Swiss-Prot record:
Binding site for Mg(2+): 22, 51
Protein name per Swiss-Prot or TrEMBL: Geranylgeranylglyceryl phosphate synthase
NCBIfam families: GGGP, GGGP-family, PRK04169.1-2
One annotated Gene Ontology cellular component of this protein: cytoplasm
Naturally occurring in which organism (per UniProt): Methanosphaera stadtmanae (strain ATCC 43021 / DSM 3091 / JCM 11832 / MCB-3)
Domain of life assignment: Archaea
Gene Ontology BP terms: glycerophospholipid biosynthetic process
């Protein structure tokens, strides 16, 4: 199955929710249990990755999920170690507002030959860090876009589109106090033809609804799933408003 086609076809029916699993935060067994509950709660895919990833843990986690859960598993690599041959697809991303060329094209060039050999489907994506940015903003040497400067986000998103990317990910950072401002999402969606992913700071159904109504195509939640006592209930609260 071509994952990008699956996403585009599903978007004709409803907006999407991805459950983010960070192998650094869960054991493979815990990751499988989260993925099972995500499937039951109608999440549309499992996103696997983090800012710091051990490749052995990643391989075990992805393989375990694939063996037990019938959902697409998409990689969200934080570095060249964030690649696994067991995944269905990979968000091949460039951190657009990094000050370090390594995160813009360096890591991508280093990992590309291995990805080619593995035969993993790649989805070209621009990754944009918005304040506060969290761990990924620090690790990625980014200049997080101020929350009142939506025009800067639009400029980067247009650049991503003109460079041939088909997806833009607006990231507030894992565990952010609040989600991406709605005007960022609205303007990027209106002024580009990109698939818009939004993550960071989405903790409640109301948050998810605001982001969806602003124009997000795919909504990512991770921290809120890690911290809840009832994974199924929390994800279902989100998917009920997203779908």
């Amino acid at each position: 199955m071509n994952i990008e086609n699956y996403l585009n076809e599903t978007l004709k029916e409803h907006k999407l929710h991805f459950t983010l699993i960070d192998p650094d935060e869960q054991t493979p067994q815990e990751a499988v249990e989260i993925a099972k509950q995500a499937k039951k709660a109608r999440s549309d895919a499992i996103l696997v990755g983090g800012s710091i990833t051990d490749q052995e843990d990643l391989n075990i986690t992805v393989k375990s999920i694939k063996e037990e859960v019938d959902l697409p598993v998409i990689l969200f690599p934080g570095n060249i170690s964030g690649v696994s041959k067991y995944a269905d697809a990979l968000l091949f991303m460039s951190l657009l507002n990094s000050t370090n060329p390594y995160w813009i094209t360096g890591a991508q060039a280093l990992s590309a030959p291995s990805i080619k050999k593995m035969g993993i489907e790649t989805i070209p994506m621009g990754y944009l860090i918005i304040e506060p940015g969290g761990t990924v903003g620090w690790v990625g040497d980014s200049k997080p876009i101020p929350r009142k400067k939506s025009d800067l986000a639009v400029a980067y998103a247009l650049a991503a589109e003109f460079l041939g990317m088909r997806v833009i990910y607006l990231e507030a950072g894992s565990g952010a106090d609040s989600h991406i401002p709605v005007d960022f999402i609205m303007k990027v969606k209106k002024l580009t033809n990109l698939m818009v992913i939004v993550g960071g700071g989405i903790k409640t159904a109301q948050d998810a609804l605001e982001v969806k109504e602003a124009g997000a195509d795919i909504i990512i939640t991770g921290t809120v799933v890690e911290e809840t006592d009832d994974t199924y209930k929390k994800i279902k609260e989100l998917t009920d408003v997203i779908h």
